[in-house]
Amino acid sequence: MKYILHRKGYQVLKAYDGMQALKMLETETVHLLILDVMMPRLDGIRATLKIRETNSIPIIILSAKSEDADKILGLNIGADDYMTKPFNPLELVARVKSQLRRYTQLGGNVSSTQETIYEVGGLRINDDLKEVTVDGEMVRLTPIEYNILLLLMKNQGRVFSINQIYESIWNEDAIGADNTVAVHIRHIREKIEINPKEPRYLKVVWGVGYKIEKL
């Protein structure tokens, strides 16, 4: 894995266990993490939970477990992507490239003097600064969560199906997309809604998809 990423031009730092990965994140400039579920000392699940307390860096989890429940768990704890072993190394490279592109866009420099802002009620996205606020309070979103919310905010009132959301954000065919999108939608609601079970902004249209409600 390290070899193929090097061949594709990426600089790779290797940690031998989860604790070393956390220390490396504090001392090195890291733009993406690939964590194995079975890492010693601190496994990939617990490492992801710890990282998500303070950092929105893209995380790809690797696991030999292919069941939907394991994938949902990985996404539930804040991972941006989940791959089951064995996998094609070129697919990993493609996913790394995709996650880094989103992360770079999310943290990109502002060059325009006119801000691009989308608002509904107390929910506000400044797409130049890549900032999300609710009633003036800053909200921390992962790159995937931000891009989903931005897609819906740009098209307030329009219903997007799960497949449309997946294909727009992941840029790949929506195979098995239901659980993946649903988990990220739930995370967004937990961060922007006062009561996620009775959302004001991010609504579901049963049997169709999701939308940002016009207020």
Segment roles from a protein language model:
Residues Y16-Q20, D43-R46, D70:
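Acidic catalytic/metal-coordinating carboxylates
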Residues L49, E53, P58-E119:
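Basic, amphipathic DNA-recognition helix from helix-turn-helix-like DNA-binding domains
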Residues E28-I34:
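Active-site beta3 strand of CheY-like receiver
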